[in-house]
Amino acid sequence: MTLDEQIEDLLSQAPGFWHLDACGVTRSERQIPALLHGVDQPPAGERLQLVLIGGLSGRQEDADAALAALHSYRTAPGLSGRYALSAAPCANPDGLALGAAPENGAGGNPGTAYPPPGDSYYDANPEAHYLWRWVSFQAPDLVLEIRTGEATTWEGSALCLELLEQFRSVLNASELPSDSSLLGALSTGEPNLLPPVFGLRLTCAAADLDAELNKLWTVLGQVPDHARSPTRSALQARAARSPLDAARILAGVYGHELDPVIYTQGVAVSGRLRLAHLDAEYADPSDGIAAMVAPYMSGAEEWFPAGGEGGANLAGLVWADELAAATGDTRYADLLVQTADRYRATHDNGVPIPSNPNYQVEDMFFTAAVLGRAFKLTGDEAYLSILTRFLLDAKVQQADGLFWHDRRTPFYWGRGNGFAALSYAETLTYMPDDHPDRAAVLAIHRRHLQALRGYQHRSGMWRQVVNGPGSYPEMTVTCMVGYALARGLRRGWLDAGYTDMLTRAWQGVAARIDDHGGLVDVCTGTGVQQSTREYLDRPAIFGPDERGGALSLWFVTEMASFLQEN
């Protein structure tokens, strides 16, 4: 049987026991299969969380051993009531399918070179990047690696061997070396800026596997119920923070610069002003922001120098109406209205000059952000007319409800769909209830969110390629869709049926904001690409990032507003 057939056979033996997922995508665009057991991410229940890794070598016998271990776990009396086991049973599927073991057929070797260097996930060894991130964010209490070999050996991380004496006395486990293997690297230092994992590695002949696993299941029965790994505890602590807690962290890092004037910085400036409105303990940033933009206001610096006049730059003023309200200085509001007037001139096809004539989805947000606010400030219907004509003429939404990147680019980019969700939420925020185009705008928006509902991962996240299983869970699309959900629920154009979708998005994002404002997997700046492969290969930023920080801050403040009102 093929690997896929083996997995299907395993799943058919106990329907519903595991959920088939993908934890990565190889260079040949083959999914790295993952079997998920349990509901919450990070896990909130009482069961201890196990993660099994097999097939790193790309050899059939190693994948067979991992699948046999899954069967043994499922049929062991009482074990699944105390432990939830998820697995990547063949972590090197290209090596297996292409006969390239232990390499992956693209010049990489998923069994070595951990932690993987550089940004993710576009190099010759994407399996290593995907596995490195995936294992940690399963919040495992124990990671078990299984591989075949002539001699039987158990190896455990220092933390694991300290947890329970029986790992040594029953399994005769020696200490796992701190090497460049996946388990060795996960067991030391700060993998993914999280504490190290508890790790065990079993090497044995196939004929000895059942006996060795039965020893392990017996030992695991003696692990204390409260034995949570540091990794799981850290992720649960992130999940336990309130949106205001997360907002305070983000506001300490982002929104303190506006050079150049661009939405990736301007949204964060707006986020700081919103946080001050929500949190009496957060110092009013208005004076500091006014001082920051003073060189622009005086004319000493240009707002939009040559080459910096696109929609992304104009949307860098989304804070201006809020600063005008906070300070009473109407010059900021006037600036925003003057900027909105740039949208009055059009390309030959009627698209406003600051926007791409092919109706790129990012321009939907830039246009809505500027023109919606200009209408709010002036009451001039012309701004709404330009905006709604752009949205309704775009025809970028497809029959399934999702959005292409533009009219000529048939790919469901994650942040592209985030831009679309955010743009319609912003438009509906400023559009009067009796506006003749409101029903059409709202219908598109609801159909989009309903489509996105079907692609929300169990972690709460949406992926870099929305309909691409195994592409990485991406931070900005989740924040933008989360914002649209929270705004719609607050303002009443979405019903309570969307609340669970929002809650899950918040949980996913919360786990991916560290205590210093670092973020997990923010797609770098991305123009129109020519293939799914090119979207998969856009670098995923891990750590501080102004784009991700800005959109996260908007989402968490909107989430805080939703919770305060409900």
Q: Which residues make up each language-model segment?
A:
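Short glycine- and acidic-rich boundary segments immediately preceding or forming the N-terminal edge
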Residues: 1-35
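Active-site-adjacent mobile loop/cap segments within catalytic or ligand-binding domains
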Residues: 155, 162-167, 176-228
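Extended ligand-binding groove/face enriched in aromatic
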Residues: 298-408, 412
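Extended ligand-binding clefts on enzyme/binding-domain cores
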Residues: 361-362, 372-465, 471-482, 494-533, ...
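Alpha-solenoid repeat junctions
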Residues: 269, 276, 324, 375, ...
